[in-house]
């Protein structure tokens, strides 16, 4: 009972916070400086239903090169399903504390867990976030262990996982073609990919200028597909040395290049720094889906992209090696890919 009580206490979503607990307060030099954020900038938007395939491929390539992030519209995932995913996520975080405590763990190796911050075992300052982490592929292997409450959770999230995986594979094809590679290159090279999900919950924060939902980081995987709360902004992307706010566009999904696609592109495409900030007015939720290479597959720059004028930027490695290195460090240290340069 004592351990369960401690787990409940760890979660931000179990209470309303009128004051800022000290363990969330960043040193002054590490605070988000919200007054310097560019609020009216835009990241590229790509219409996947455009009949001009060449234009879609070109737009995806340009976005990967210049921003590392883009939004997609007309992506084929039904708006009603997207709304259901967000609603069932909110229902989960509103469950009684004792119900949520059944899933709590601070062990990053667990495939299904509810936790808080990022890596509470290593951190000295925590982040203003609770999250439910799920492994999603193959579905039949993991769904039985997913939350049984809310009752519709497994069906809704399972359907979304299947559709978002197919969207990811379509995007791989466009990304491959934009690099001058065969359309199937990325999917084939990355092997039988794992798929993870993080359902992120950012409660109202009494002093948002003192902390983060997540500090600046890059994603260690290949491709991330983010479903954002279309009522509350919070994602910010580093572009040309400035933090820009990603303003939610109804019906859109946000795509970002992970570290592995930067490596496969030989540095042509960018896995960029991004962060999540919080606010004092409203809670916020997001659902991030991660496509991850097979652990044992060898990764490195595509041979076709290595020339005398453009030698290999990164050495070959396995995703297992990369992921272990990523988790052994603090989230906001130097870009993990720097450790794999030739």
Curated annotation (Swiss-Prot):
Q: Which residues bind 2-oxoglutarate?
A: 284
How is the cofactor bound here? Answer: Binds 1 Fe(2+) ion per subunit.
Q: Pfam families of this UniProt entry?
A: 2OG-FeII_Oxy (PF03171), DIOX_N (PF14226)
Residues recorded as binding Fe cation, renumbered to this chain, are 217, 219, 274
Keyword check for Iron: yes
Query: What cofactors are annotated for this protein?
Result: Fe(2+); L-ascorbate
Instruction: Report any one BP term from Gene Ontology.
Output: flavonoid biosynthetic process
Has keyword Cell membrane?
Answer: no
EC number of the protein: 1.14.11.9
Recorded hits in InterPro entries, A to Z, give: DIOX_N (IPR026992), IPNS-like_FE2OG_OXY (IPR044861), IPNS-like_sf (IPR027443), Oxoglu/Fe-dep_dioxygenase_dom (IPR005123), Plant_2OG-oxidoreductases (IPR050295)
Q: Which UniProt keywords apply?
A: Dioxygenase, Flavonoid biosynthesis, Iron, Metal-binding, Oxidoreductase, Vitamin C
Against SUPFAM superfamilies, the record matches this protein to: Clavaminate synthase-like
Where is the Fe2OG dioxygenase domain positioned along the sequence? Answer: 193-293
Family annotation (PROSITE patterns): FE2OG_OXY (PS51471)
Top-rank taxon of the source lineage equals: Eukaryota
Its tissue distribution reads: Expressed in roots, leaves and stems. Expressed at low levels in seeds.
* GO molecular function, a single term: L-ascorbic acid binding
Family indicated by similarity? Belongs to the iron/ascorbate-dependent oxidoreductase family.
Task performed by this protein? Catalyzes the 3-beta-hydroxylation of 2S-flavanones to 2R,3R-dihydroflavonols which are intermediates in the biosynthesis of flavonols, anthocyanidins, catechins and proanthocyanidins in plants. Converts (2S)-eriodictyol to (+)-taxifolin and (2S)-naringenin to (+)-(2R/3R)-dihydrokaempferol in vitro.
Name this protein carries in UniProt: Flavanone 3-dioxygenase 2
- Which gene produces this protein? F3H-2
């Amino acid at each position: 009972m004592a351990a369960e009580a401690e787990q409940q206490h760890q979660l931000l979503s179990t209470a309303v916070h009128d004051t800022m607990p000290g363990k969330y307060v960043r040193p002054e030099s590490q605070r988000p400086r919200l007054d310097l954020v560019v609020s009216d900038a835009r990241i590229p938007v790509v219409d996947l239903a455009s009949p001009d395939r060449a234009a879609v491929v070109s737009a995806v390539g340009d976005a990967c090169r210049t921003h590392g992030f883009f939004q997609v519209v007309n992506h084929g995932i039904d708006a009603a399903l997207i709304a259901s995913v967000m609603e069932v996520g909110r229902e989960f975080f509103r469950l009684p504390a004792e119900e949520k405590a059944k899933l709590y763990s601070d062990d990053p190796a667990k495939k299904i867990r509810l936790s808080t911050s990022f890596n509470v075992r290593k951190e000295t300052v925590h982040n203003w976030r609770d999250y439910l982490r799920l492994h999603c592929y193959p579905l039949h292997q993991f769904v039985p262990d997913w939350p049984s409450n809310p009752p519709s959770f497994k069906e809704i999230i399972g359907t979304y996982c299947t559709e978002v995986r197919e969207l990811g594979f379509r995007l791989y094809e466009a990304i491959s073609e934009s690099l001058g590679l065969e359309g199937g290159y990325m999917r084939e090279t990355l092997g039988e990919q794992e798929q993870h999900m993080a359902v992120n919950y950012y409660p109202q924060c009494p002093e948002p200028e003192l902390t983060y939902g997540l500090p600046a980081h890059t994603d260690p995987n290949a491709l991330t597909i983010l479903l954002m709360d279309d009522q509350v902004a919070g994602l910010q992307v580093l572009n040309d040395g400035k933090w820009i706010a990603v303003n939610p566009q109804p019906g859109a999904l946000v795509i970002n290049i992970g570290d592995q696609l930067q490596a496969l592109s030989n540095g042509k495409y960018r896995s960029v720094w991004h962060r999540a900030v919080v606010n004092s007015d409203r809670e916020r939720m997001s659902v991030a889906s991660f496509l991850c290479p097979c652990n044992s597959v060898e990764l490195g720059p595509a041979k076709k992209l290595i020339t005398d004028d453009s030698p290999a930027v990164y050495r070959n490695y396995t995703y297992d090696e990369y992921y272990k290195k990523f988790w052994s460090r603090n989230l906001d240290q130097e870009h993990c890919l720097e450790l794999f340069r030739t």
